[in-house]
């Protein structure tokens, strides 16, 4: 019988939950507002309500996987310091949910970028590769490493933080405090600011009309829409972003000798407006011996990979520990 798990993507604005089949992927899904400003207790109440909803009528669910921002301990039970989640200094999610659920269930927590990478590896475009680097472009820049179809976590579980890798030691500071980190260029807020400066004197750009003459309202989504309509200014901004991404990925490839790269997250919807520049830049920043087989692809499953990966985390854990669910 095909195993099922509940996969949860805990985002800053939305909690997305799905019932995941090991063989076919997402069966059904639901989402509710996170309400992160209410603090961890209320947010965990909402997570528990989604778990309860999916367990009703699905007695064969073998566990719950949660992808969350912030630092995750090695045991995959505790979330510490997730950005934009007030009061989450260190929250033992496993214990908190156990006290809220009528029936105990295996619960695992993973960094959200790691969960997305695992989802891509088993249900998305990443299934073509046994090893790849995952980059997620959204509010911030996330990263993960898949090595032989499993998450590579490093010595303490925090490997893969590509967003904190620097491309300019005297550059602008990212939220992490790292000067010139790639997130300081490609994070949503930073990219929008760069677009404002770049387009300020290009009065013929569609962006002025789309933002109703107030460039403070520019978003990455607007850039993509304008590029689709042929706006050269928007295309230039997205190509600039792709160039920066290619620079940092060159360092990652040189370090890891992993030559396949999957790009996901909301900004990845801009597709080749970003990725063409990434590919053409990347080749110039990778040592010749590692240039063979380089490939940069867009994740086609969108934001579903977070839920899928969180669910698959459960299946992988059961297999690794030789556990047969009751």
PLM-predicted stretches and their roles:
Residues 8-13, 136-140, 158:
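A short acidic Gly-Thr/Ser loop motif
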Residues 106-111:
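General beta-strand structural signal in soluble alpha/beta enzymes
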Residues 116-122, 143-145, 164-165:
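Adenylate-forming
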Residues 34-35, 87, 159-161, 167:
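A short acidic/small-residue loop/turn micro-motif
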Residues 1-63, 72-78, 97-105, 119-130, ...:
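ATP-binding/phosphotransfer module of carbohydrate and carboxylate kinases, centering on a glycine-rich
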Residues 77-90:
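A charged helix-plus-loop insertion that forms the helical arch/lid used to bind
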Residues 15-19, 141-146:
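Short beta-strand scaffold segments in enzyme catalytic cores
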């Amino acid at each position: 019988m095909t195993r099922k798990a509940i996969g949860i993507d805990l985002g800053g604005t939305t909690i997305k939950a799905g019932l995941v089949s090991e063989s076919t992927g997402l069966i059904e899904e639901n989402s509710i507002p996170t309400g992160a400003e209410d603090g961890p207790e209320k947010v965990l109440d909402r997570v528990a309500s989604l778990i309860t909803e999916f367990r009703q009528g699905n007695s064969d669910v073998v566990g719950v996987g949660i992808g969350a921002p912030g630092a995750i301990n090695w045991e995959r039970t505790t979330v510490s310091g997730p950005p934009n989640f007030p009061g989450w200094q260190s929250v033992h999610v496993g214990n908190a949910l156990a006290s809220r659920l009528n029936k105990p269930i295996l619960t695992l927590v993973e960094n959200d970028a790691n969960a997305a990478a695992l989802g891509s590896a088993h249900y998305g475009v990443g299934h073509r590769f046994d090893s790849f680097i995952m980059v997620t472009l959204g509010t911030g820049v996330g990263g993960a490493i898949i090595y032989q179809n499993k998450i590579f976590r490093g010595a303490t579980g925090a490997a893969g933080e590509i967003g904190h890798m620097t491309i300019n030691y005297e550059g602008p500071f990212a939220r992490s405090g790292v000067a010139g980190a790639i997130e300081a260029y490609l994070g949503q807020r930073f990219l929008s600011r760069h677009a404002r400066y770049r387009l300020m004197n290009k009065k013929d750009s569609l962006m002025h009309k789309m933002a109703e003459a107030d460039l403070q309202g520019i978003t990455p989504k607007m850039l993509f829409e304008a590029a689709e309509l042929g706006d050269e200014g928007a295309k230039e901004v997205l190509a600039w972003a792709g160039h920066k991404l290619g620079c940092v990925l060159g360092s990652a490839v040189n370090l890891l000798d992993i030559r396949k790269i999957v790009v996901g997250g909301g900004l990845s919807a801009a597709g080749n407006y970003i990725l063409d520049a990434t590919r053409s830049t990347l080749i110039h920043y990778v040592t010749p011996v590692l240039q063979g087989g380089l490939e940069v692809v867009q994740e086609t499953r969108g934001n579903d990979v977070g839920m899928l990966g969180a669910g698959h985390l459960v299946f992988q854990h059961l297999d690794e520990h030789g556990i047969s669910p009751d």
